[in-house]
């Protein structure tokens, strides 16, 4: 991972200090940069995609997007509106089903979820015990977006609550994704 640049796109509430995204950023500060949203707790889609685009416009080297949860949908909505030759791929972890989740009814503008082939390679990693999307729905997203799909089993929402720590499995999957 040290020879590539990464832009992390956290989801609702951002990624706290025990989240694998934060741990990866702290271990590789020269290679990782986080998109900072205006409001992490009251997400508005057009604001989130504009903040992502601001960061993408600053890129000077080819970069991979590493998105978690609502950050994954931010990437998809961004790609539906913008493009950049600097984006080499998107690593999309636990995209939520905002169209069918009552837990996420307060978020604004993320529904409907775009259904088009992303203009860069992408990988969705999902869990069979994610409370924000069924494994079947995550697989539907992969088909719609032209993404590879990996089911990693019972890992919850693949966040700090999943007790993944540095998420070595995720690092290995990212390295495999980059090298294909």
Predicted region positions:
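Active-site catalytic motif of lipid deacylating hydrolases and related acyltransferases
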Residues: 2-61
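Active-site nucleophile loop of the alpha/beta-hydrolase fold
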Residues: 11, 36-40, 90-100
